[in-house]
Design a protein with these regions (language model features):
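Carbohydrate-associated surface elements
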Residues: 171, 190
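Membrane-proximal helix-turn-helix segments that form the acceptor-binding/catalytic region
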Residues: 88-92, 145-165, 179
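N-terminal strand-loop element at the rim of the active site
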Residues: 5-13, 26, 30-77, 175-177, ...
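Short hydrophobic beta-strand element within catalytic cores of glycosyltransferases
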Residues: 305-309
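A short, well-ordered alpha-helix in the C-terminal region of glycosyltransferases
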Residues: 256, 263, 276, 335, ...
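Conserved acidic donor-binding segment of nucleotide-sugar-dependent glycosyltransferases
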Residues: 320-322, 326-333, 341-347, 362
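A conserved mid-protein helix/loop that constitutes part of the nucleotide-sugar donor-binding site
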Residues: 14-22, 206-229, 246-253, 334
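Aromatic "clamp/platform" in nucleotide-sugar-dependent glycosyltransferases that forms part
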Residues: 269, 288
Length: 386
């Protein structure tokens, strides 16, 4: 069987990139499938995550990100040209590869919609919850509201042409079922690595770990405000934030304004994040919204109790409140601060949640999730082409 994954690039380190890479690597290492990865903005950039040597990589030279270097008129002209090129090249590449199944994401629909009329079995993965896609697609400004609304409906029509949509959470499945007619199933993200041994919880540093891109979505500005409310009570505790992104200067300024330079540190992203988990006592998740929350299960696999905003979607389906972590009302900084304060003060509660977090994260291990994908592929391969 030949499986083709399509994604714009693996230049940046992120959850989608990590999961796509892990799934392709698993299939290449553990099945007889031929796996091909098609990108269109990778160019000569190194891959953020290492791909198995059995995976065939094809890059189609369509650099949409570079269009922002031009004025709006030239940008739109070049955008039209690039989209025609992408359609032609994707069509030719798929014809050459002749895949049994093609997999893409809801985020890339705006680019690769042009191939959904081709006679292949298409699967679309939803890595950003549906309501956020609506919010980002339909602008508030009156003069472009109608146009963006039409664009969103057009986008849904393209998703409807796919054989199947795979959601990461039950909540996201319910949301998608209201707006598309395609079949929808749930397969959660896989846990990249489940350590055989972890550091004894009693020997860990008094630090709170946060991980993610430095963007508004990840809510690190909220986390800084949370810590500002209780930092004076816990002078022997530190907050370490790992990630890269455009908001680094803004977040550093916020840290400075609150006088938290001695207790909050922004670090660049690291390829050894599990080492950081092993030396952390709490994992704080401050996202405004998520598709799943991969970093939560990574922390839990290392026995780190988590505290999270109950944002849409993911945390409430991963964290059982009071058992393996704590959930607080989405965006409620005071409640988050109070819950974090209580968590810090109650070592026995943290140790109890640490044990349960490690146990509960096992269901996301590759050997438990990937058979669901293989079963799906085998089932679809027995159906007639669209």
């Amino acid at each position: 069987m030949k499986i083709v994954y399509i994604y714009h690039s693996f230049i940046l380190k992120g959850g989608i990139e990590r999961v796509f890479c892990d799934k392709m690597n698993y299939l290449a290492q553990n099945t007889s499938y031929d796996v091909t990865f098609i990108t269109f903005e990778q160019g000569n950039h190194p891959f953020a995550y290492k791909l198995n040597d059995r995976i065939k990589v094809v890059d189609i030279n369509c650099r949409f990100a570079e269009l922002w270097n031009y004025n709006i008129i030239k940008r739109n002209i070049l955008n039209f040209i690039l989209r025609r090129k992408l359609k032609k090249c994707l069509t030719a590449t798929l014809k050459k590869e002749s895949p049994d199944i093609v997999i893409s994401t809801t985020e890339d629909i705006k680019y690769n919609y042009c191939i959904f009329n081709l006679p292949y079995r298409f699967i679309v993965e939803s890595h950003v919850h549906m309501k956020e896609i609506i919010k980002s697609s339909i602008k508030k400004q009156f003069f472009i509201h109608s146009i963006s609304k039409i664009f969103f409906k057009w986008k849904l029509s393209k998703i409807n042409k796919c054989k199947l949509l795979v959601a990461l959470t039950d909540a996201d499945k319910r949301d998608w079922s209201k707006v598309i007619n395609s079949d929808i199933i749930i397969i959660p993200n896989i846990l990249t690595f489940y350590p055989d041994k972890i550091t004894d919880y009693s020997k860990r540093s008094k630090r709170i770990l946060c991980v993610g891109r430095l963007t508004k979505q990840k809510g690190f500005d909220l986390m800084i405000k949370v810590w500002a409310k209780i930092a004076d009570k816990h002078k022997d505790w530190k907050v370490d934030i790992y990630g890269d992104g455009d908001l680094r200067d803004t977040l550093n300024e916020l840290i400075n304004n609150y006088g938290l330079n001695d207790s909050i540190t922004l670090h660049s992203s690291t390829s050894n994040i599990y080492n950081e988990h092993m030396d952390s006592s709490i994992f704080a998740f401050s996202s405004r919204f998520e598709g799943f929350g991969l970093v939560l299960i990574e922390a839990m696999s290392c026995g780190v109790p988590c505290i999270s905003f109950d944002c849409p979607h993911g945390p409430s389906e991963i964290i059982t409140n009071g058992k393996n972590g704590l959930l607080v009302q989405n965006g409620n900084i005071d409640e988050f601060a109070n819950s974090l304060d209580s968590m810090i003060n109650n070592y026995e509660q943290r140790k109890f949640m640490s044990i349960n977090a490690r146990i509960d994260s096992q269901k996301y291990k590759r050997e438990n999730i990937m058979p669901q994908w293989i079963e799906l592929f085998e089932t679809l391969s027995k159906t007639m082409r669209i």
